[in-house]
């Protein structure tokens, strides 16, 4: 898979005329809210190509958590967001994107600067510097800045500072260096009223993302397809979980998709870019458990997915270290039975629970239990008519631990880990649609 992506990247270089422009490097940011998450996402993005006609979304939480290609029904819209990013972090990584000469770049950054206490003048200077570098490295790229949403997550003092940033950047943009889009006007009141967010505006729900996508559709050049969803979900799940489910339920229900189901390991992967075929959708939710996936499989009703690729179970043990492997298998069994009943024509691939590395605080005893569940998953494939994929062995070292090179924090995957996983999925016809009915039989023999 990595070799395939290298070929894509090489092609991008040829298409852009071997851009030789360079600028003095930007210093690495002096602070991170989540160092390992930044390393994970930045490392993965560094391996993914961008093409001349691509639209690239760069920036903070709002960008990272959006499924932009699905909002507009266009796989050329690329997500390069990293949750917790501030203007320093975007500035640090913008050159790599700009050198590949995308058609458009959208930047959302500044909220985390305010939360960190960064001065107004510094934020404004960083935004100007971002677009100055883009204009020098890729003069033909159209640039857009999505201004700071002055939501309740900010103190009154921070809101006042944010208003000054927005005003200064709006005035500067009149010079033509980039267009400033007033997304604050589209989102602020809906967030304050609890329609677009349930946590004060750090996260957006389906209605919030619908409003945001609508606010920038003219600049994107395509109509937004995601519809408002502001239904609240059970309080016993995390804020992130509720907002993510709401966003997923707001997306167009298209038939015949290959659906990636699971927890953060699935959630954090750019599946449409790893397999740029236009019909793979990411339905992972960070923190999800087997029963959580079970409770949301109804969202695919009427869509007749071609395939489900399921990977979950990690958080069952994280949330309850005393739970037995047999109990987790029973949860899997119930989920698999219902998938088979509700989606009888959908191919089901059940992937092993991945091991952890000693760097993880949940490492003690985890790998042994995960291995027990994996044996039961393997043993049940013929009874319940699914393909079992042993991804765990591919990313494990001689001790059965997650390889150091496959992880940043001992539990989540690095770019190397995702490439190994993707290479296994790429074998044969697994990631192709509408296959011969003998496929499942062939896989299990």
Where are these regions (language model features)?
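Conserved beta-strand scaffold positions in the cores of enzyme catalytic domains, especially
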Residues: 57, 77-79, 180, 260, ...
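Oxyanion-hole/transition-state-stabilizing segment in secreted/luminal serine hydrolases
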Residues: 58, 63-76, 87-124, 148-152, ...
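Charged helix-capping and loop-helix junction motifs
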Residues: 120-130, 159-166, 325-333, 366-374
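A short helix->loop->beta-strand "cap" motif at the edges of active sites that frequently abuts
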Residues: 138-142, 343-347
């Amino acid at each position: 898979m990595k070799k395939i992506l290298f070929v894509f990247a090489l092609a991008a270089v040829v298409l852009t005329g071997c851009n030789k422009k360079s600028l003095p490097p930007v210093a690495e940011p002096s602070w991170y809210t989540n160092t390992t998450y930044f390393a994970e996402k930045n490392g993965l993005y560094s391996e993914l190509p961008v093409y001349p006609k691509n639209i690239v979304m760069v920036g903070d939480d709002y960008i990272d958590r959006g499924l932009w290609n699905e909002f507009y029904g266009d796989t050329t819209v690329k997500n390069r967001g990293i949750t917790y990013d501030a203007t320093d972090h975007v500035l640090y990584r913008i050159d790599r994107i700009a050198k590949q000469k995308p058609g458009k770049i959208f930047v959302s950054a500044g909220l985390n600067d305010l939360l960190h206490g960064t001065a107004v003048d510094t934020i404004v200077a960083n935004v100007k510097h971002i677009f100055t570098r883009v204009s020098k490295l890729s003069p033909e790229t159209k640039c857009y800045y999505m201004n700071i949403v002055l939501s309740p997550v900010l103190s009154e003092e921070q809101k006042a500072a944010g208003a000054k940033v927005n005003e200064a950047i709006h005035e500067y943009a009149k010079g033509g260096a980039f267009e400033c889009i007033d997304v604050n006007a589209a989102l602020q009141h809906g967030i304050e009223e609890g329609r677009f967010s349930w946590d004060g505006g750090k996260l957006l729900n389906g209605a919030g993302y619908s409003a945001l996508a609508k606010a920038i559709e003219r600049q994107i050049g395509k109509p937004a397809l995601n519809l408002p969803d502001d239904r609240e979900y059970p309080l016993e799940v995390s804020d992130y979980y509720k907002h993510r489910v709401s966003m997923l339920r707001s997306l167009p229900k298209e038939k015949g998709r290959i659906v990636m189901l699971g927890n953060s390991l699935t959630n954090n992967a750019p599946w449409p870019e790893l397999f740029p075929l236009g019909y793979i959708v990411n339905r992972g939710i960070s923190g999800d458990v087997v029963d959580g996936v079970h409770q949301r499989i109804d969202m695919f009703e009427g869509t007749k997915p071609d395939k489900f690729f399921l990977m979950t179970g990690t958080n069952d043990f994280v949330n309850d270290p005393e739970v037995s492997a047999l109990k987790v298998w029973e949860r899997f069994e119930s989920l698999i039975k219902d998938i088979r009943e509700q989606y009888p024509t959908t191919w089901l691939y059940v992937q092993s629970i991945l091991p952890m590395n000693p760097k993880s605080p949940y490492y003690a005893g985890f790998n042994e239990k995960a291995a027990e569940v994996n044996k039961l998953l393997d043993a049940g494939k013929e009874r319940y008519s699914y393909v079992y994929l042993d991804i765990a062995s591919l990313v494990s070292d001689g001790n059965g631990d997650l390889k150091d090179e496959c992880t940043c924090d001992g539990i989540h995957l690095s770019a190397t880990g995702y490439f190994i996983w993707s290479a296994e999925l790429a074998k044969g016809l697994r990631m192709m649609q509408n296959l011969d009915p003998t496929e499942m039989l062939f896989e299990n023999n």
